[in-house]
Amino acid sequence: KEEPPKKEKPKKQRILKAVLTCFLIGVITVAIVAGSFLVYAFTMVDGTVDQNLNDLKLNFTTTVYVENDKGDWEEYQRLHGMYNRIWVDYDQQAIERGDEDYKGIPANLANAFIAIEDKGFETHYGVNWKRTFGALLNEFFHFKDKFGGATITQQAVKNLTDDRKQDAGRKVREIMRARSLETKYTKDVILECYLNTIPMGHGTYGVQVAANYYFGKEVDELTLVECACLASITKAPSF
């Protein structure tokens, strides 16, 4: 007797099987890549940040004052090296107390940068993994949306170390160093470092020099709108 012809599987089943196979291959590939990344990160990458943030302000622009004919002190000259930066403190406790003598970075400016650059700054531990993987996938699939993977902590690390190498290990080093920085310093100290080292266009670095350059004001004199404008410059520092 002749054997009856084998029934072909429905088209939907074949498609489902193909999709599941591709999914499993993708999961296995991601697992292998993630495992390799972790091995590389923990064995080959220097995740330390040598810079002491408490000493960082000593390397900034020095302002020289002279006494005029009326006996008042006025700015005579600013002395700086490669980077024109003036350090200003960020003290959230003084802001909350309503300290009238506080002349540091205003809350509106700090909040504007967090809102634009890193909404999860207060809750993450140096790295926003969702954004990081989104940026990684965007490198391969070129989505219409742009993914900024770096957190404020990671950007502070980049400004501190000046690590601009375009190699596979740079992002890994940045992530490891950001995690390390979060274990050593408070969020306020990290934010203060970031706001004082960020490039703001036209050779200015940090929010104090940027406030002087763009608005002719001290940083504590900025209005809410001016704070928002400064924060938006980070998206286009040649503004």
What annotation goes with each model-predicted range?
Residues 1-239:
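Juxtamembrane regions of bacterial inner-membrane/periplasmic proteins
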